[in-house]
Amino acid sequence: MKGQEWYQEHDIAEAYDDKRFSRGGRFIDRREKEAVVEALSPVGEKRILEVACGTGRFTAMLADRGADIVGVDISEAMLEQGRRKARTAGVDGSIEFVQADGGRLPFPDDHFDSVFAMRFFHLAPDPQEFMAELCRVSGGQVFFDTFKRYSARSIYSWALPMGSRLYSEREVRELLVGAGLKLADAGHDFFVPYGFYRQVPGWVAGPFRALDTAVVRSSVGDRLASVSYWNARVSE
């Protein structure tokens, strides 16, 4: 997994949320959480697995909404942040954090109602292997995001310290078919790449986000977006 050693560092884990989701990054955080809630709802009493849960941004949020949730990450440093976040939110009793490799999940087949992974597939060395594993442990739904190959993201992706795998729609559909999944729904967002939002204060990012949203909702929005959200179902 790209970045595996990087994310094991405690100082990296401690600064992760602030570096990405403060300033203009809060618009990214808000949109990602909206996408997850929309895809997985209703979550009450649902058995959910989050793969690559990181600092527990989504894990704690879904537990607060009534989900019975397990968060998996390969980094113990990230899991420590997740446990801390869960305690602060008062939902630690509803979450189980497990250190494990997303390609070898320690759960039986069809163990969860829904499985999701955010900010995961751009780092996956073998996307097909990981997709098959997510499908294996899900009894119904797999939700995930990808960065689009033909988008503004491609302009700077090469310069990122760990690189960033980009996907065309055809590649994602092939991944789904290969894993035994059927696409139920897809959404696309962020013509302006994430990197911009992280670098500017909120008062600058706000107007850009409004313009960004208008572009994405236009007739050419799907083609210009840099992020895609994929909602798939396990094939019968």
Language-model regions, residue ranges each:
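A C-terminal cap/extension of S-adenosyl-L-methionine-dependent methyltransferases
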Residues: 185-236
